[in-house]
Amino acid sequence: MHTEMKYRFLIHYTLSFIGGYLGLYAIVSRADLFGNAQTANLLGVVRDLIGRNFSDMLLRVGALLIYMAAVILTVWIPEHFSADLRFISIGIDIFAILLLGFFPSGMSPVVALYPVFFAMPFQWCTFKAPGGYNSSTIFSTNNLRQFTTAVTQFLMKKDSAQCDKAKFYGMTLLSFHTGAALSLILYMTCGLSGIWLCLVPAFYAVWLISADRNTAADTPAVTRSTASNGSSLRNLSYKKKEA
């Protein structure tokens, strides 16, 4: 594997670890709320609206707006600044991790997860999966679907491309749920401050991104173009096989 691509796969797996860590931390520490996504929160808005629990509804609407603001910023920032959005995203993750450990246990669970509602969608929209795959680092449903279909197609057709695809999605799922498992263990032993161990993979991600930038700068343009073309051809192959 080309060194540049190796770093990008490692970045993806590291971010999946962080996504799983923050995801389960939110669930076990804040009333079973999953801060990485909005589905449950939006259903809560509907429930509170019909049940006329307007105070809780407003808190959930606040979480929705924060989530949307993060998505908007990932579009707006590249149009106005030349900074690497990946560093900004990891910086937001680090700040969110620091904040979460200081929030008291008695505060509103929704408000306590506002940093997660901002950091996770920012990460989701910033980092694209390597190798042309379609994979999120903050939740698992699509990753599980892709892994299952790839394994099924490999068993039926013995296609090596599907084997590679299954390995990628399998590693993504493993990274995500390893982070989730460690998050639970640290929460059980350290309480709310257990979130701070997630700073280790976050700073490791910073190092990986720096290494990826340096490698990309040292790689001749022709080599990068060839690698990109190879990825595009593989994507086309997947589309034909999955059509």
Task: Show the residue positions of the predicted features.
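Alpha-helical transmembrane segments of multi-pass membrane proteins
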Residues: M1-A243
